[in-house]
């Protein structure tokens, strides 16, 4: 995937945030990320607008709930009777913020079997960013109990490679990723309504949500979009397939790489390349749910491609460490500093 011409630890743009967390971002590494996007420039990009965000909480936050598309629910994986379900998101808007706003896509965890867009920690992130000028969406997606539509190749892979006890969770990876991309496409489709600059979209998650954020930052445009036809799943027509699902930065909290491993197993091709979105990796070294080795594997992939990353191991910390600090910075402060630096946003006092 490709991102605008931002430098990995670029020494440009406003530094007020980095002054507070300079030690936190000292581990950032990488090379310049090439420009380009198969979807072409957005209207805001064509106008040359760079988003202006605020140093402190400034804007009142208005929240609302929207349906971003539909998906099929099956009575059995790979078949059975079907019924459409609405896919929902909560939208957070900064009242009075200037147009050309950046956006943050927030994705909940829960092992692909539970969790909700209304999780308190996620709402905290949404309100923190929105009060400073971002438009945020916190999304729901199909889970194991929904048994979303699967491509035939995924069904065969699961039968051949995954133990029966794990097949339900592994199967849920596909519709969850498809839904996450649909939510980003909804943002693009509604960019004018919410005054967005879609050249500045970030994806952030926790646990399973970070699996999906990494998918958004690394996979190719056709992945989790073209494997299923509209004749197999008529609800695809509701998911803005004419829009891109590109994100420019990823914030990973204790996520993993299983989607990418399955894609590579299916076609023999790694999705990591020098156009991937820069990533901030936060992961507890004592995580017993998603092993710390997943963070190390993600870092190794970014080292190999030369794309910018920051690596923040939480020593002795387990899974879901939302209250952790790094160099005295909260996870919200850590994330916003990384986004501002990577995207070279303009910061207003």
Regions found by a protein language model. Name each.
Residues 296-299, 303-349:
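C-terminal catalytic histidine-bearing segment of alpha/beta-hydrolase fold enzymes
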Residues 100-110:
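Short beta-strand element of the alpha/beta-hydrolase
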Residues 25-47:
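Ser/Thr-rich, Pro/Gly/Ala-heavy low-complexity intrinsically disordered linkers and tails
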Residues 118-138:
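Short amphipathic alpha-helix adjacent to the substrate-entry channel of hydrolases
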Residues 281-283, 287:
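Short beta-strand/loop motif that positions the catalytic acidic residue
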Residues 154-192:
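Alpha/beta-hydrolase active-site loop
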Residues 47-98:
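N-terminal cap/lid segment of alpha/beta-hydrolase-fold proteins
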Residues 178, 182-266:
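Primarily recognizes the serine-hydrolase "nucleophile elbow" in alpha/beta-hydrolase
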């Amino acid at each position: 995937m490709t991102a605008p011409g931002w430098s990995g630890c670029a020494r440009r743009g406003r530094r007020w945030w980095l002054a507070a967390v300079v030690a936190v971002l000292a581990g950032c590494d990488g090379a310049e990320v090439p420009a380009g996007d198969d979807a072409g420039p957005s209207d805001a990009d064509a106008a040359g607008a760079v988003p202006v965000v605020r140093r402190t909480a400034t804007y009142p936050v208005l929240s609302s709930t929207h349906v971003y598309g539909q998906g099929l629910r099956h009575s059995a994986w790979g078949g059975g009777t079907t019924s459409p379900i609405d896919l929902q998101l909560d939208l957070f808007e900064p009242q009075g913020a200037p147009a050309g706003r950046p956006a943050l896509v927030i994705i909940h965890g829960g092992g692909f079997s539970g969790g909700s867009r209304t999780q308190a920690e996620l709402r905290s992130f949404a309100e923190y960013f929105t009060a400073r000028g971002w438009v945020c969406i916190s999304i729901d997606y199909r889970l194991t109990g929904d048994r979303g539509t699967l491509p035939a190749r995924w069904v065969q892979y699961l039968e051949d490679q995954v133990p029966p006890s794990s097949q339900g969770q592994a199967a849920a990876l596909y519709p969850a990723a498809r839904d996450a991309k649909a939510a980003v496409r909804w943002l693009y489709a509604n960019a004018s309504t919410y005054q967005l600059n879609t050249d500045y979209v970030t994806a952030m998650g926790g646990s399973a949500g970070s699996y999906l954020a990494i998918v958004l930052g690394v996979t190719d445009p056709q992945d989790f979009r073209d494997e299923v036809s509209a004749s197999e799943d008529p609800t695809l027509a509701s998911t803005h397939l004419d829009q891109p699902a590109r994100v420019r930065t990823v914030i990973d909290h204790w996520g993993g790489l299983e989607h990418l491993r399955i894609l590579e197993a299916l076609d023999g091709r790694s999705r990591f390349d020098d156009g991937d979105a820069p990533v901030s990796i936060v992961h507890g070294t004592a995580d017993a749910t998603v092993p710390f080795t997943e963070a190390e594997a993600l870092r190794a992939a970014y080292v190999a491609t030369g794309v910018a990353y920051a690596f923040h191991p939480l020593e002795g910390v387990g899974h879901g460490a939302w209250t952790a600090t790094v160099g005295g910075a909260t996870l919200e402060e850590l994330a916003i500093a990384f986004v501002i630096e990577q995207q070279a946003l303009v910061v207003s006092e």
